[in-house]
Amino acid sequence: MARITIEDCLKRVPNRFLLVHMAAKRVRQMREGSEYLVSSPKNEDIVVALREIAADKVYVSDNMPDEL
């Protein structure tokens, strides 16, 4: 995948505040040991999280506890 942009992510998550919340939560999950959902070698966790969101691999669940 080429360079990831916020616009790519906003196509999947139209609310930019929700996008930031999702990316932060996903980074936290990865740092706690969760596996990456997309292949993205040599990238920082935030870039991987945004790639996952743009690829529609991450979604919001109503049952998800809010830890932010």
Swiss-Prot record:
InterPro entries in the record: DNA-dir_RNA_pol_omega, Pol_omega/Rpo6/RPB6, RPB6/omega-like_sf
EC number: 2.7.7.6
Transcription is among the record's keywords: yes
One Pfam family this sequence matches: RNA_pol_Rpb6
Keyword annotations of the record: DNA-directed RNA polymerase, Nucleotidyltransferase, Transcription, Transferase
Residue ranges of the TM segments: none
GO CC aspect terms: DNA-directed RNA polymerase complex
Catalytic reactions of this protein: RNA(n) + a ribonucleoside 5'-triphosphate = RNA(n+1) + diphosphate
Biological process annotations from GO: DNA-templated transcription
NCBIfam families membership: rpoZ (TIGR00690)
Subunit description: The RNAP catalytic core consists of 2 alpha, 1 beta, 1 beta' and 1 omega subunit. When a sigma factor is associated with the core the holoenzyme is formed, which can initiate transcription.
Cited function: Promotes RNA polymerase assembly. Latches the N- and C-terminal regions of the beta' subunit thereby facilitating its interaction with the beta and alpha subunits.
HAMAP family in UniProt: RNApol_bact_RpoZ
Family membership noted in the UniProt record: Belongs to the RNA polymerase subunit omega family.
Protein name listed in UniProt: DNA-directed RNA polymerase subunit omega
Biological source species: Desulfatibacillum aliphaticivorans
